[in-house]
């Protein structure tokens, strides 16, 4: 298992132990389970309907749209929300500080931040959060 997978699995186990996910979340009578599914990593599976096909055990190829919009007809024909990791990474900060604070970062036409992966023959490979509209590749 890759380091990132280990960290995600550990974080999910900690969330279950703390009562943030699972049955009767924090005594609210609301329950949700999260299942981690490690894909093969094919680029095309980044397209939401291809990801759903892969999760269903099929070849990870995009479905024809319409009528297959995941919010109405997704995993096993059920309504499905598909988010990328960058969207999910922004949620804790947004929920803590609010949309106005988030949109105050960056530029007027490109507010907020984004994640970028730097790899190859570079001095500091990794995943970085940058402010939209202000950082260049040279930086």
Give the residues covered by each predicted segment.
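Short amphipathic, charge-patterned alpha-helical segments
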Residues: 133-139
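Hydrophobic alpha-helical positions that pack around
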Residues: 5-132
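Glycine-rich phosphate/pyrophosphate-binding loops
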Residues: 1
């Amino acid at each position: 298992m890759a380091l990132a997978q280990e960290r995600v699995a550990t974080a999910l186990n900690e969330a279950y132990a703390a009562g943030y996910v699972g049955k009767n979340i924090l005594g609210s009578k609301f329950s949700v389970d999260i299942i981690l599914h490690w894909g093969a990593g094919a680029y095309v599976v980044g397209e939401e309907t291809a990801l759903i096909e892969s999760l269903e055990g099929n070849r990870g190829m995009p479905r024809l749209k319409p009528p297959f919009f995941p919010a109405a007809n997704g995993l096993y024909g059920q309504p499905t929300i598909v988010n990328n990791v960058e969207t999910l990474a922004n949620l804790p900060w947004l929920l803590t500080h609010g949309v106005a604070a988030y949109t105050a970062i960056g530029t007027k036409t490109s507010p907020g931040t984004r994640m970028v992966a730097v790899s190859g023959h570079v001095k500091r490979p990794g995943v970085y959060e940058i402010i939209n509209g202000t950082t260049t590749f040279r930086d």
